[in-house]
Amino acid sequence: MSSESRSASSPVAPDDIEEGVVLRPKFDAHGLVTVVATDARTGDVLMVAFMNGEALDRTIQTGEAWYYSRSRKRLWKKGETSGHIQKVLEMRVDCDQDAVWIKVDQTGGAACHTGRHSCFYRRIDRGGDGAPVLIETDSERKFDPDKVYGK
């Protein structure tokens, strides 16, 4: 079911959204919903991305994570280039169905295009002058992005 057909349906009572058993994702003005992917084993947040209706449907149907790239304006399967596929073990939707949480088995160990396990590899701290500084918390790369993506 596409995002257009989901959003074009008749109005739904808030109780149906918050307590019902029917998936009714609330896509934004661009037809996207925010997705948080976590490592099912460790609970680590791996990445935040977006799905359109087709990506959501493919993820549900295949059991592998599909996303919509806002920069490339196209659907993409996680790991289609790197081989680091996300096998979806569980999917959840938040209370008002405008965000999706997927628990995944991250094959190859890297979710980030930089080659790291997680896209959240820097912590925000305050420097001596109080200005924010980024502190690297994960320097280990599971792969060389230049070799994988040919940059």
Swiss-Prot record:
<dbReference type="GO" id="GO:0005737">
    <property type="term" value="C:cytoplasm"/>
</dbReference>
<protein>
    <recommendedName>
        <fullName>Phosphoribosyl-AMP cyclohydrolase</fullName>
        <ecNumber>3.5.4.19</ecNumber>
    </recommendedName>
</protein>
<dbReference type="GO" id="GO:0000105">
    <property type="term" value="P:L-histidine biosynthetic process"/>
</dbReference>
<keyword id="KW-0963">Cytoplasm</keyword>
<comment type="subunit">
    <text>Homodimer.</text>
</comment>
<dbReference type="InterPro" id="IPR038019">
    <property type="entry name" value="PRib_AMP_CycHydrolase_sf"/>
</dbReference>
<comment type="function">
    <text>Catalyzes the hydrolysis of the adenine ring of phosphoribosyl-AMP.</text>
</comment>
<feature type="binding site">
    <location>
        <position position="119"/>
    </location>
    <ligand>
        <name>Zn(2+)</name>
    </ligand>
</feature>
<dbReference type="GO" id="GO:0000287">
    <property type="term" value="F:magnesium ion binding"/>
</dbReference>
<keyword id="KW-0862">Zinc</keyword>
<feature type="binding site">
    <location>
        <position position="94"/>
    </location>
    <ligand>
        <name>Mg(2+)</name>
    </ligand>
</feature>
<keyword id="KW-0028">Amino-acid biosynthesis</keyword>
<feature type="binding site">
    <location>
        <position position="98"/>
    </location>
    <ligand>
        <name>Mg(2+)</name>
    </ligand>
</feature>
<feature type="binding site">
    <location>
        <position position="95"/>
    </location>
    <ligand>
        <name>Zn(2+)</name>
    </ligand>
</feature>
<comment type="pathway">
    <text>Amino-acid biosynthesis; L-histidine biosynthesis; L-histidine from 5-phospho-alpha-D-ribose 1-diphosphate: step 3/9.</text>
</comment>
<feature type="binding site">
    <location>
        <position position="112"/>
    </location>
    <ligand>
        <name>Zn(2+)</name>
    </ligand>
</feature>
<dbReference type="GO" id="GO:0008270">
    <property type="term" value="F:zinc ion binding"/>
</dbReference>
<feature type="binding site">
    <location>
        <position position="96"/>
    </location>
    <ligand>
        <name>Mg(2+)</name>
    </ligand>
</feature>
<dbReference type="Pfam" id="PF01502">
    <property type="entry name" value="PRA-CH"/>
</dbReference>
<comment type="similarity">
    <text>Belongs to the PRA-CH family.</text>
</comment>
<keyword id="KW-0378">Hydrolase</keyword>
<dbReference type="GO" id="GO:0004635">
    <property type="term" value="F:phosphoribosyl-AMP cyclohydrolase activity"/>
</dbReference>
<dbReference type="InterPro" id="IPR002496">
    <property type="entry name" value="PRib_AMP_CycHydrolase_dom"/>
</dbReference>
<keyword id="KW-0479">Metal-binding</keyword>
<keyword id="KW-0368">Histidine biosynthesis</keyword>
<keyword id="KW-0460">Magnesium</keyword>
<dbReference type="InterPro" id="IPR026660">
    <property type="entry name" value="PRA-CH"/>
</dbReference>
